[in-house]
Regions:
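Short N-terminal secondary-structure initiator segments
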Residues: 2-11, 30-41, 48, 173-190
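Short low-complexity stretches enriched in small and charged residues
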Residues: 2-11, 44-50, 155-164, 230
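Non-heme iron-sulfur electron-transfer modules
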Residues: 2-24, 50-84, 98-128, 427-433
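Short, intrinsically disordered, charge-biased short linear motifs at domain edges
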Residues: 26-40, 70-82, 225-227, 357-360
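A short alpha-helix capping/helix-coil boundary motif
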Residues: 16-19, 28, 60-62, 71, ...
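Cysteine-centered iron-sulfur cluster-binding motifs in ferredoxin-type domains/subunits
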Residues: 36-55, 77-101, 116, 140, ...
Length: 440
């Protein structure tokens, strides 16, 4: 594509950077130039109209108010466009002008949104909602300290009204259940915890599995064991930092990343692969840590990025080895509906959870790639709950077929979204395989 006839060049400005270690990253004038350029290119392309509301909002401003003049968009309207992005990453996957594809325009809309949020939240106090949603480890610890009361109250109308009015968490949003026992406590009890020991793999169970659904982690350990994969569990891991970073909180992201690197790198340097159960966490460690950390931490992040795998991805890579186990006691169902999470698609590594289930069980699998609309904390917020349901409707409808009784997704939060809006909670691929190995 050649440069268009407007006064705004499609070529990168001198303000182009996606690296927060670069002083230019924090220059608001430089950011505004890049936003203007990006809006101009997106206005001429419009391939991403079907994803989040950022693009329809941008196009509505240009078509209905400003006759296509990007320069007329006001700062508050830019804020509205940025707020509608929930970091699904699908626009970057599909963009023909991306850095990933080596195009000279070097577009990355999600990273531009992150930059905007980082600049506009820098040195400002965080809201109570952002403190709670951006720190799932702390929120879960508080919930567990209530001895089960939090789980009860999260389903009581008056309490949900309070959460909506004072925290901005939608009263109708199905919230995750908090487990009485963490995955780490279970692993400690079974003597699975190891420190700086040589292991083939080490598990990053994720904050969701740690606090909300330890069973997924247990199933993962079980499936790895069935395939003779040596896996170490470790103490003290923190959230990957994505909930904080989606709000522009770079400081918390970097602190969590540094903490996790301190624990994981000794294993990585001995040759261990790191298996993270949630695609979002894999994406953060594979793509975001190396780009967002600085100094020695960036070097360590690159080592981790080379070692990170999804459990299904790791098992798929050993499928031709003699230890790979296809001896099952139960076929879950003849046909399965599989949802591919956005952050798995963003990595470009294929759908190994789906492929693994098909290879081991022989089930026919229908694949649905539309976004479910949950996207981290987006679906929880009062201002975006309805939009998340609307955005996810195609995926809800796509999963429903008369011949499928079992639904699968690699993302536990997507499973929560399907449970609420489609009436079926998909299982994790590791849980499907664990059942297949054991059930009769």
């Amino acid at each position: 594509m050649v440069e268009n006839q407007s006064r705004i060049s499609y070529l990168p400005t001198d303000g182009l950077t996606y690296d927060p270690s670069d002083s230019m990253y924090w220059d608001k004038t430089a950011l505004d130039k890049e936003i203007e350029r990006t809006f101009e290119i997106c206005h001429g392309c419009r391939m991403c109209f079907k994803y989040c509301d950022s693009f329809p909002t941008l196009f509505n401003f240009l078509d209905k108010q400003y006759e296509g003049e990007v320069k007329k968009i006001k700062p508050q309207e830019t804020q509205q466009i940025m707020d509608a992005c929930f970091q699904c990453k699908l626009c970057e996957v599909q963009c023909p002008y991306s850095i990933r594809d080596g195009h000279e325009f070097k577009l990355d809309f999600p990273k531009l949104v992150h930059r905007h949020k980082a600049i506009h939240s820098k040195d400002k106090p965080k809201s109570l909602r952002n403190n709670i949603l951006g720190n799932p480890d702390k929120s879960a610890s508080m919930a567990r300290a209530s001895l089960g009361l939090a789980n009860v109250m999260n389903r009581v109308g008056i309490h949900r009204w309070f959460l909506e009015k004072f925290l901005g968490i939608h009263r109708n949003k199905l919230l995750p259940y908090f487990s009485f026992t963490t995955f780490e406590q279970w692993a400690t009890k079974l003597a699975l915890i190891r420190e700086n020991d040589k292991a083939e793999t080490v598990l990053f169970q994720t904050c969701y599995v740690q606090h909300n659904e330890p069973q997924i982690g247990k199933d993962t350990i079980d499936v790895l064991d069935k395939n003779k994969v040596d896996c170490a569990c470790v103490k003290g891991l923190k959230c990957c930092g994505m909930p904080a970073w989606e709000q522009g909180d770079l400081e918390t992201l970097r602190a969590n990343a540094k903490h996790n690197l301190d624990i994981l790198i000794p294993f990585v340097e001995q040759g261990s692969k790191v298996l993270a159960i949630n695609p979002t966490c894999v994406m953060m460690m594979r793509r975001e840590y190396p780009a967002l950390l600085e100094g020695d931490d960036r070097e360590r992040a690159n080592k981790l990025a080379d070692a990170i795998n999804d459990p299904s991805e790791f098992l798929w890579n050993i499928r031709n080895e003699s230890r790979f186990n296809t001896n099952i006691n139960n076929v879950p169902t003849e046909t399965i509906s599989y949802h591919a999470p956005c952050h798995l698609r963003a990595q470009g590594v294929g759908f190994k959870g789906r492929d693994l289930i098909k290879k081991v069980t022989g089930s026919k699998i229908k694949t649905v790639i539309e976004c479910c609309g949950h996207d981290g904390t987006y679906a929880m917020k009062v201002e975006s709950f309805d939009a998340s349901k609307r955005i996810g409707q195609k995926s809800f409808d796509g999963m429903k077929t008369e011949e499928t009784e079992v639904w699968v997704t690699d993302c536990p939060l997507a499973a929560l979204q399907f449970k609420q809006h489609a009436g079926v909670k998909p299982k994790h691929p590791m849980s499907i395989l664990a059942d297949a190995y054991h059930s009769k």
